[in-house]
A protein has these predicted regions:
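Short, solvent-exposed loop/turn segments at the edges of extracellular beta-sandwich modules
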Residues: 99-105, 203-206
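Extracellular interdomain linker/stem segments of modular secreted and single-pass surface proteins
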Residues: 28, 115-123, 219-224
């Protein structure tokens, strides 16, 4: 009898191990393995998260049985993959059931939470205020995406007749998953009543992705 070739023997052992592992998995109780809090999704951006289970009798099927996924996302009943591009911000809670192929079938249910967040966040650090000769303030920024972005920020004060005056301009590379605690702005202005507008635009040229965030004062500021 000829000795087994090493490659054939290795393939045989791998096959035996895989079959043994599958048998062990099938003999174990059905269980959802994915953590209850899913990775955040970015508004309007492509998203994918895979739900996983172990035990029970494969193949398994998945279904949302309570609550709802964020608009724009869907659950694949075969693979357990949640994918799509969400169209609404918020924190979403929903329950998912997995069913195996045993006879009778076994099921398990788990509630998940999924947050849909803005790619770019701009907030007042120091709200605009009248100074001795104009208006000044500051904002804080957050890039919540996984991309470094080209960021442009423009701050203007618009008076009662619609004339705009520049209060600030910034352009720089904004690192992924980072924040800038304060960016100041301000300038001397003629006497008048002004609404302050902040417009922030981020771009990822390689993906042709653009996001925008805005702020404005709720009431006019009167300079003297």
């Amino acid at each position: 009898m000829k000795p087994m070739r090493p490659i054939f023997l290795a393939a045989l052992l791998i096959g035996i191990f895989a079959a043994f592992s599958a048998a062990q998995d099938a003999g174990a109780p059905l269980e959802i393995a994915t953590e209850r809090t899913l990775p955040n999704a970015i508004l309007s951006a492509s998203y994918e998260a895979k739900l996983t289970a172990k035990g029970g009798v494969p193949p398994r099927s998945w279904a949302v049985i309570a609550g709802a996924l964020p608009a724009g996302l869907n659950l694949d009943p075969v693979s357990g993959t949640i994918s799509g591009a969400p169209t609404a911000l918020g924190l979403f809670r929903f329950a998912v059931e997995v069913t195996d192929s045993d006879d009778p079938a076994d099921t398990r249910t788990r509630e998940f939470t999924l947050a849909v967040i803005s790619a770019l966040v701009v907030e007042w650090k120091n709200p605009p205020a009248v100074t001795q000769d104009g208006i000044a303030g500051s904002v804080k920024l957050a890039n919540q995406t996984a991309d470094d972005v080209d960021l442009t920020m423009i701050v203007v004060a618009v008076n009662e007749i619609g004339k705009a005056f520049a209060l600030g301009y910034q352009r720089f590379t904004f690192a992924a998953q980072s924040t800038i605690p304060e960016i100041p702005f301000g300038s001397a202005l003629p006497r008048g009543n002004y609404i302050v507008h902040v417009d922030v635009i981020s771009e990822v040229p390689e993906r042709n992705a653009i996001d925008r965030a805005r702020l404005q004062t709720s009431a006019p500021l009167e300079t003297h």
